[in-house]
Amino acid sequence: MQDYLVRAVASDGNFRIFSARTTNTVEEARTRHNSWPVATAALGRTMTAALLMGANLKGEDTLSIRVLGDGPLGAIIVTSNAKGEVRGYVQEPQIHLPSTPEGKLAVGAAVGKGHLHITKDLGLKEPFTGSVELVSGEIAEDFAHYLTTSEQTPSAVSLGVLVDTDNSVVAAGGLILQLLPGAGEEVLEILEQNLRQLPHLSSLIKNGETPEDIIKRVTKGIEMKFLESNPVGFSCQCSRERLENLLVGIGKDEVTSMLQEQGAAEINCHFCAENYHFDKKDLQRILKRIEEKD
C-alpha cells in the first residue's frame, strides 16, 4: 500500500483531524541511514509529525523541525513541505538502549531532555520559529505540547513506528486532532473517550487499517466530512548540481586546497545519505567557474 495522508473535519466545524500511513517513508529513511530500532522509531515519529503538520502548508511553504535532546541520539532534523515530501536524519543512528519495562523502544531515554524547535517558512519576510521544552522525548507528547502552547491550538497527537527483529519497519503512521474555536464539552468527552480506547496506531496499521479507518475510530459518534487525501513520501532536494554550486560558493582557496591535498572531494548529504564524488577534473572545472565569476 502506498503511503498517504487524509484530512477530515467535523461536520459542525468543531475540530479537524489529519491521519497518515508512513510505513514506506520511514523504511526508506531507515534503509538510507542504516538506523537501529530506537533511532528509526524516533526519526520515524518526527517525520510522520512533520508530514501531518505539513498538511496545513500551501504552495512553496516549508517546515523545519529540530528535536535537540541531551540523550545519546543527538539531534533529529526533519524538513517537510506542502507537497507531502519529507526528509530527515538523526545524528547518531546506531545506538542501542534496553527496552522500557513495558517492552517498548526507549525513545524518551534516547532523545533525553531538551527542546523542540519548529520553523515555518511561509514566504514572508522572516520565517516563524516556535520553541518548547521537551515534555518526555517520546515525540508525540512533545508535538502536542508545542501545538497547544506555541500555536494555541489544543491538540492530541498519536505517532507509531513498529520495527521488526531484522530492523525493518513493519508499520508507521500517525494522527493529529485539533480543536477549533467553539468546540463544546460534549464533543470533547466523546473524543477523549475514543482516544483512550484507541489501540496503538502501529498495530492498527500493521493489521491493514487505513488512515480513514483510524479517523473513524477516533471520531466514532461524531458526524465527519472527509476532505482530500494525498500521497506522502521520502524526498530529498539534494543534487549534484546543487552541491557543485555549494563548492563554487565556498571559494577559490578551499577548492584549491581540496585539489592539492586530496585531488578530489567527497560530499555526503545528511538528509538522504547520498554520496557525491567530485574528481580532479570536476574540481578544476569548478575552480574555473569561480575564477570566471570573480
From Swiss-Prot:
Belongs to the HSP33 family. This is 33 kDa chaperonin. CDD domains: Hsp33. One of its GO terms (biological process) is protein refolding. GO terms for cellular component: cytoplasm. Keywords: Chaperone, Cytoplasm, Disulfide bond, Redox-active center, Zinc. Disulfide bonds join C236-C238, C269-C272. The gene is hslO. It comes from Desulforamulus reducens (strain ATCC BAA-1160 / DSM 100696 / MI-1) (Desulfotomaculum reducens). Under oxidizing conditions two disulfide bonds are formed involving the reactive cysteines. Under reducing conditions zinc is bound to the reactive cysteines and the protein is inactive. One of its GO terms (molecular function) is protein folding chaperone. It is found in: Cytoplasm. Redox regulated molecular chaperone. Protects both thermally unfolding and oxidatively damaged proteins from irreversible aggregation. Plays an important role in the bacterial defense system toward oxidative stress.
